[in-house]
């Protein structure tokens, strides 16, 4: 995403105000850090809502997976896109707010016992929004992101094999 490009060390600027984004990286309590956290969790909240709605809509027909996909091609496109977005959001949250797997190992932790960020897979209730979910292990976060991304690829591949592709940019 663009924020990552702007805050990297080799971002080229065409004016003399180099370093204007320096204060963004001073600490996790800085406003833009809070914005990043909220931005990705808003995406996750909305994708969870979509995933649950789509599962409820197409999951009751007793069809094989391919028959179900053929019967609901548009819904499965949305489902695949939403899963990809949720996986992307978790991967970015992990990148921005947690240690890398190498850093975790260097500090003597395993991926299973290093607590990183909360994982939400259901729609958040009012209580969840007030209190928040407990932290999940880095292993759980990476697993969630990987499962979502692999599922998205899987559904896109099936849709493509069945001849259901989107070639217009606005449909992506």
Short names for language-model regions:
Residues 1-3:
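Acidic, glycine-rich segments characteristic of secretory precursors and extracytoplasmic regions
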Residues 7:
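Transition-metal
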Residues 13-99, 132, 136-139, 151-163:
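Conserved, well-structured interaction surfaces
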Residues 61-68, 96-144:
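Short coil/linker segments at helix-helix boundaries
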Residues 148:
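Aromatic-glycine hotspot motif
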Residues 166-168:
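Long, repeat-rich segments with strong aromatic
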Residues 170-172:
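Aromatic-residue-lined binding/catalytic grooves and analogous aromatic/hydrophobic interfacial grooves
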């Amino acid at each position: 995403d663009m924020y990552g490009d702007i805050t990297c060390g080799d971002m080229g600027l065409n004016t003399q105000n180099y370093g204007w984004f320096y204060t963004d990286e001073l600490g996790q309590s800085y406003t833009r850090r809070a914005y990043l956290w909220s931005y990705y969790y808003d995406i996750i909240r909305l994708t969870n809502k979509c995933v649950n709605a789509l599962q409820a809509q197409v999951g009751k027909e007793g069809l094989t997976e391919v028959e179900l996909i053929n019967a609901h091609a548009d819904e499965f496109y949305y489902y695949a896109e939403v899963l990809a977005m949720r996986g992307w959001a978790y991967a970015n949250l992990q990148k921005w707010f947690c240690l890398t797997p190498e850093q975790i190992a260097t500090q003597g932790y395993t991926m299973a016992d290093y607590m990183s960020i909360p994982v939400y897979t259901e729609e958040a209730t009012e209580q969840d929004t007030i209190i928040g979910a407990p932290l999940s292990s880095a292993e759980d976060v990476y697993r969630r992101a990987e499962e979502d991304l692999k599922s998205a690829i899987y559904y896109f591949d099936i849709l493509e094999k069945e001849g259901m592709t989107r070639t217009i940019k606005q449909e992506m």
